[in-house]
């Protein structure tokens, strides 16, 4: 492996090959989050790279197992990290904003695999909650509007009610207050 970082083109090619390895039926829907979702949806700059493709959900569930199984073959073929398809993101489902499924953006259909990314406001919310250095850089690139910050402040209590830790919730509100524009320009 020469470069652990994946460009949007590499991610798209890997997803296309993954789709070609799946059986023709049933159709599967994969929902991605994180940097891959941001660059493939156009919310983040195409120059941004990521080490993986974070999978929030695949339905039907049995297709999730097949995707993970075939991900190793994709990694070998494209000489990318074996963990390029990160299934651990499904543990973040409780952090999704109300209505997130209505805001999904279609990335492409690769054989029987339809790949969708979280919408912009949901991507921003997840980056605010994560609050890591790379997430803060992404938030700078996303240039949060005043209206988006207000929308997040209205929706965040629903996440708190679903079990986010008090420390994580407080940290997310702090990040949002720092990133929040003071007025619309």
Where in this protein do the model-derived segments appear?
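Compositionally biased terminal segments of proteins
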Residues: 1-185
